[in-house]
């Protein structure tokens, strides 16, 4: 009999970040930063396609049998907050 251990929340989040970075890389983006934190919050993955376009993401890895879509975990207020937080990132980078 085979028993399967459930992943911990930390393991699931780490797997989600690897999956996201792999997908962004396949789309032609290059990773700039993972798990960037400031006093106001955290961005999980920051990637760039060009010098003028940067993708900032806050990941939510959910273990479920049915996915209800990304809007379930990203209400408009959270999207606005992430956009604001993304604007803080370049000011905190020496090379950007």
Swiss-Prot record:
InterPro entries recorded for this chain? tRNA_endonuc-like_dom_sf, UPF0102_YraN-like
A molecular function (GO) held by this record is: nucleic acid binding
Pfam families reported for this sequence: UPF0102
What does the sequence similarity comment in the record state about its family?
A: Belongs to the UPF0102 family.
Name under which the protein is recorded: UPF0102 protein ML1607
Origin species, per record, is Mycobacterium leprae (strain TN)
Top-level taxonomy:
Bacteria, Bacillati, Actinomycetota, Actinomycetes, Mycobacteriales
């Amino acid at each position: 009999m085979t028993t399967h251990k459930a992943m911990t929340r930390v393991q699931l989040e780490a797997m989600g970040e690897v999956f996201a970075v792999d997908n962004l890389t396949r789309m032609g983006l290059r990773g700039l930063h993972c798990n960037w934190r400031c006093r106001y919050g955290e961005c999980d993955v920051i990637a760039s396609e060009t010098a003028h376009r940067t993708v900032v993401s806050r990941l939510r890895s959910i273990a479920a049998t049915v996915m209800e879509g990304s809007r379930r975990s990203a209400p408009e207020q959270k999207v606005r907050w992430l956009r604001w937080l993304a604007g803080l990132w370049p000011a905190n980078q020496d090379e950007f």
